[in-house]
Amino acid sequence: MKRNALVFIAVLLFLAFFAWAGWANLNHRSQAARCLLASTAPRGLGSANGGAARYVSPLQGKPAPAFTLEDLSGKKVSLADYKGKALVLNFWATWCAPCRIETPWLIDLRNRYAAQGFEVLAISADDLDRRNPTRLSSEKRQIARFVQQMQMPYPVLIDADSISKPYGGLDALPTSFFVDRKGTIVAAQLGLTSKAEIEANIRKALGANQ
């Protein structure tokens, strides 16, 4: 009887391991697909110049949807806190390889245009398990390590999934929305483009091209 119980427990553990492995593999593939989509041409993309697709968001010309998120310290940060500034709302994740390429460009451009009233809000799309405080703390530390490693000087917010719907679903990463001083989205970029294109859209948000 005791031996049967041990065998039963062993089978349960075996099945639990494979269930976890299957979930982890599916999650990894889902993350990879979101980055892979960045180099394809989904709906809303116009003609490409030099291989970089130009994205036309349905939100362009409309007010940026309001939100309130937490930063890594737990402080509440709202879009309204940056009223009167030109912004890039940059949706990214620690596991996103194109985001790792793009981040140094954003850092340089932020430092270059900050004196003109420009800021980057980096909104992490990393998964957060709020039902498990231990896991949540570990996930936040992972994001914080990335931020420290990349020396990101601008605000970093978490839980992008909670605001993904009003911003069009965030089918690919990185995704950026360029917001002018009046709070209107003047441009958007889906996936990795180029530093020059990011700078051009920052200047548009600042009104430098008008």
Where does each model-flagged region fall?
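N-terminal targeting signals for export/organelle localization
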Residues: M1-P63, Q210
